[in-house]
Amino acid sequence: MRFEKLFTVVSFSIFFLTACNKIEYHPYDGRINGKTGINKKNIALIEKACAAKDTVRFAVISDTQGWLDETARIVKSINSRQDVDFTLHLGDLSDFGLTKEFEWQRDCLEKLARPYVCLIGNHDCLATGEYVFKKIFGDINFAFTAGKTRFVCLNTNSREFDHTTSVPDFSFIKEQQEIFPAEAVNTVAAMHAPPTSEQFDNNISPYFEYELLSFLKRAA
């Protein structure tokens, strides 16, 4: 009888161990396979490639969530051009903030011949989406210089955050004004949710626009 119990325990243990690699993790688990920290790496490539250029040309795409076939066609179209220095994705890579959605879009965008950077969209903030976005792509507010143009990329998805978080982050905007590169003569403010959109906190729209216009004075 004791032997039978022992055999049962051992058999169960062996079954459990052999079945471990078949465990399916929760869609919002946040375990990431593949490349991470993409924006930082690609920004370094962009700044190096564009350093001596007076003019930069970049592709802008957005809201590719759930459309992998369309994203693949966009990638193919951009790759067919020789005059695009980099691609700027304005967010909504995911529909529901699922880890797999970000991985699928990343893997598709990785086929671009030239560097790309991604901003966070309102759908990307759902569930554990913000965490996954930060791991795969990087900070939700960031800036870089391509040639003589400064790109200030902002999280403006106010409705996805509570009032303990400043969205847009005016501290970041002020900091960027203070460290504005001397060589930059142009500014591109990139965001997913523009002022007047339903995702933007329109109570602060006038102040936000005023702060963005301050970049023009810095560049003048």
What are these regions (language model features)?
Residues A49-F58, A143-C153, F180-A182, N186:
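Beta-strand-turn-beta hairpins that frame and shape the catalytic cleft
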Residues N79-F86, F161-A220:
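His/acidic metal-ligating clusters that form di-metal
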Residues E70-N141, T145-A146, F215-R218:
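Core catalytic region of metal-dependent phosphoesterases/phosphodiesterases
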Residues A59, L88, V117-L119, V152, ...:
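Hydrophobic/aromatic beta-strand patches that form the interior of the parallel beta-sheet core
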Residues F96-K100, L126-E130, C153, D162, ...:
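Extracytoplasmic/secreted cell-surface and envelope-processing proteins
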Residues M1-T18:
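Sec-dependent bacterial lipoprotein signal peptides
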Residues C20-W104:
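N-terminal active-site segment of His-dependent metallophosphoesterases
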Residues S62-Q65, G91-L93, N122-H123, T156-N157, ...:
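Active-site metal-binding loops of divalent metal-dependent hydrolases
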